[in-house]
Regions:
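Active-site HxH/HxHxD metal-binding segment of metal-dependent hydrolases
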Residues: 48-51, 55-133, 153
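Acidic/histidine-rich helix-loop elements
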Residues: 21-22, 102-108, 115, 176-182
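Short Pro/Gly-enriched beta-strand edge/turn motifs at strand-loop
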Residues: 10-17, 112-116, 137-144
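Metallo-beta-lactamase
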Residues: 37-39, 43-47, 133, 140-232
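Divalent metal-coordination and catalytic microenvironments
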Residues: 13, 32, 42, 57, ...
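Basic/polar N-terminal segments that are highly enriched at the extreme N-terminus
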Residues: 1-12, 297-299
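C-terminal regulatory/interaction regions
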Residues: 238-299
């Protein structure tokens, strides 16, 4: 099986592994190779996709048993961890608990059929609260917690200060609709403000093509748009699905996975009400918004 992937050198010893088209469960990774150690930033959703990632990484010098940073707990970024045989799995302290409560493979019927393979869930072996500095040998990688619940409760990013490269994880989507149902929209907006203070020339988003720091403004505009719609929906007494169906997505209409507007409205409206997000309701309503069919997934 072949996949559409692109490998781009973003700094000496650092490559972005971009999987097209960045939609549901099709994420990006990073491959860092120093003189002393190698590091992967995230794995992939399926066994076959992770094997492709590892084959590519080894072809450019990734040594056996590298470090792996899991930028957050979601399955598209962590399902392949067992295949890597890492020396350590690094993640924020919130991630082990979130992994234990999440699904590695979504329930049948929510998404189009995917050949996931035999998934073995691997929890992080090295957690941190704020940040870690990793000297790989001629290549320093800063692993930093975003400071707040955002896309999830445990998002971190990998920053290469010497080359001004940011592996943003799912704090940044480029041309793909962000998804906040397991995090916090106000927190995500705050996290983007913090990211914008970094000196960055190249951003490797969690999903979508390589970009520059202006992408953070685009994601921020979308999240503020969701907040505005949610406020109106609460005032009008309509449901997230009803609100989503009533609006024009405007500049965001061309982004992939547009049905996430429903899940994001669930999150924003629950936040305004001080209640928990009904994740089952989120996926049921997104599927309904998409015409009642399983959600498109090419993973």
């Amino acid at each position: 099986m072949s996949f559409s992937v692109r490998l781009t050198e973003v700094a000496e010893g650092a490559h972005a592994y971009i999987q097209d088209d960045g939609s549901w469960f099709v994420n990006n990774s990073g491959i860092l190779v120093g003189s002393r150690q190698g590091l992967l930033v995230d794995t992939c959703a399926t066994v076959n996709r992770t094997r492709e990632l590892l084959s590519t990484a080894r072809g450019i010098g990734l040594p056996p048993n590298p470090l792996v940073v899991a930028t957050h707990h979601h399955a598209d970024h962590t399902n392949g961890l067992s295949l890597v045989e890492p020396s350590a799995i690094i993640a924020h302290a919130e991630v082990p608990g979130e992994m234990a409560a999440a699904f590695a493979i979504p329930p049948p019927g929510l998404f189009e059929e995917v050949e996931w393979g035999e998934i073995e869930v691997c929890s992080p072996t090295l957690t941190f609260e704020d940040r870690l500095s990793l000297d790989l040998g001629g290549l320093v990688a800063e692993v930093v917690y975003c400071g707040t619940a955002a896309h999830t409760r445990g998002d971190s990013y990998v920053y290469l200060p010497d080359s001004r490269v940011l592996f943003a994880g799912d704090l940044v989507f480029n041309g793909v609709t962000p998804f906040a149902a397991m995090g916090s929209i106000p927190g995500w907006i705050d996290a983007l403000s913090s990211l914008a203070e970094l000196a960055v020339d190249v951003v490797v988003p969690g999903h979508g093509d390589l970009c520059d720091a202006s992408v953070m403004r685009s994601v921020g505009r979308y999240l503020r748009f969701v907040e505005e719609v949610a406020g109106g929906a609460v005032e009008a007494g309509v449901s997230p699905l009803e609100a989503a169906r009533s609006i024009d997505l405007g500049e965001f209409a061309g982004w992939l996975d547009a049905e996430r507007i429903v899940g994001n409205l669930h999150a924003a409206m629950a936040g305004l009400a001080g209640s928990a997000v009904d994740l089952i309701g989120v996926f049921v309503d997104m599927k309904e918004y998409a015409g009642g069919r399983p959600l498109r997934c090419i993973a």
